[in-house]
Amino acid sequence: MTPHRLQTMVQRGEPIRERSCKGWRLDGMDLSGGVFIEVDFDGVSCIGTRFEESQFERCTLGGVRLNDAQLKKAAFSQCALTSADLTAAVLDDAVFHRCKLPGSDFSQASVVDTKFMESTLSRSRFAGGLLDRTLFFQSPLDGADLSGTRLDKAVFYQVDLRTTALGGARFERVVFVESRLGGHDFSRHHFLLCQFTDADLEGCNFEGAHMAQCNFKGARLRDAVLRGVHAPQALFPEADLSGTDARGAHFDQSLWIEAVLAGTDFGGASMQQCIFHRADCTGTSFAGTDLTYADFSEAMLAGANLDARLFRTQLHGARDVPDALRGNAGVLPNDPDLFEAQRWSAHRTRHPTPFTKGETQ
């Protein structure tokens, strides 16, 4: 088998099976649409090679040079690409499924709509690249370098990023689902419409960060630093911010339904029109906080410091309301109409009205 023979077979649509190309030079060749099964590409030079829509199954590509290679819509399944060089390669719409890519270099590569599924990416490098709509599904990135990358609509599902370098990265509409980012320093970072659903952010430093309209549903932010963050209209339902320092932050119109805020310090923060329904505010400090039109309906307020700016602040059904707030002109203690609506709703649930076909309820 020679490089020329290989190209001829690919052009004829013949699959390449159990061949060794070890040490070959395939620079600049057009191998688009090739099907490679258990082929040994270790150490092969494929600089500028065209592999569009090619398929690689159980191939070894250790140390392969794919600089500037065209790999659009290529598919890799159960392949080993240890220390592969993919700098400046085009990987748009490519798929890596159950591949081993430790130490691989994707610097300056175009990684648009690329999918990494259950693949190992430890110590890999994406520095300075574009990750646009890229999916990392259960693909470890421990020790990887994503510093200076632009992440736009990228998705990380159950990925451990605690030891991943993220300095200088740009986050736009990025989604982190059940991923771990604990301990990272994100101070003064900009997060545009990002989602951290059920993510582990324990101990992260977000001081001065911009997080307007970001979603932290179910996220763990224990002992995190949120001092001076700009996060209006952010969502924190069911999030755990126990012991978090959020002094001087801007959270106007943000949502905290059923959030755990025990021991959180919101001193001097702006929290106008925030919703704290059923939130655990045990020992929470709102000293000097602007709580104009905030709603603490059914929240737990045991030991909370509410020496704050209060104006039409709702405490409907709140538990353990501090005595100092009783009779405060800025507080709306209960809403009689809402109480009646809740009573009626509970009664209707216990005694539903029979519904007959042809009738309306």
Language model region names:
Residues M1-Q361:
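Tandem repeat scaffolds
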